[in-house]
Amino acid sequence: GNFATSSVARAMSSVPDVSNSIAVYYNNQTKTVDRETYIYTVLSSELYGKSYYTGKGLTSTQVSELYEAQAVAANTFLEYALSVYSNHSGKDYKVCSSSCCQVYDPTKVTEEAIDATANIFYTSGGKSKTDIVMYKPSSTTYDYIWGAFFSSCSGNGTKDHSTQPALKAVSCTDIATGAGGHRYGLCQMGAALRAKNGDSASNILLYYYTDCRIISCTLK
């Protein structure tokens, strides 16, 4: 999740529907995939494989919580790109396959990523649903957030974003030194340590995204 933006999301009085058809620019062409496929492909590309994290002392269940947190963050980032701001305005796609947006590489898909992503796509009340994080400072409004994430903060914590009220500075300790990053939103190495320490996916997300809730949206 690598583009910074000054675009401020609009406040809504109800939960929005989200598109199930995603156009992504990959391998020099625009491809259309369903949302779940897009998310598990991003998840496989943006995090290390399961063996890396079990090697750091996480149990299989803890790795699943980490993966699920990243899946929701990626879904949130995607919805912001579709509904609020994209680096690719005027194109027939809103997200590309590089770190300009979210890394998307179908050759790296793992079963663990598919399984974790399946947890955030489900049927409720006869409708297909998926989870994203939304800024919800009051009981009556919902705002999209830039679902930013990055590799590691090296123990320096995250930073305040000037126009994104959900992206506040929080303290953070990494499980290992990663590739660095912009320090906005979810720290992947910090999230791994929080998972190892027993945090659920939802607790990880709500730690890094301030005054937010995990919202169930209908796929359209």
Can you name each region flagged by the protein language model?
Residues 1-220:
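Conserved, single-site charged/polar hotspot
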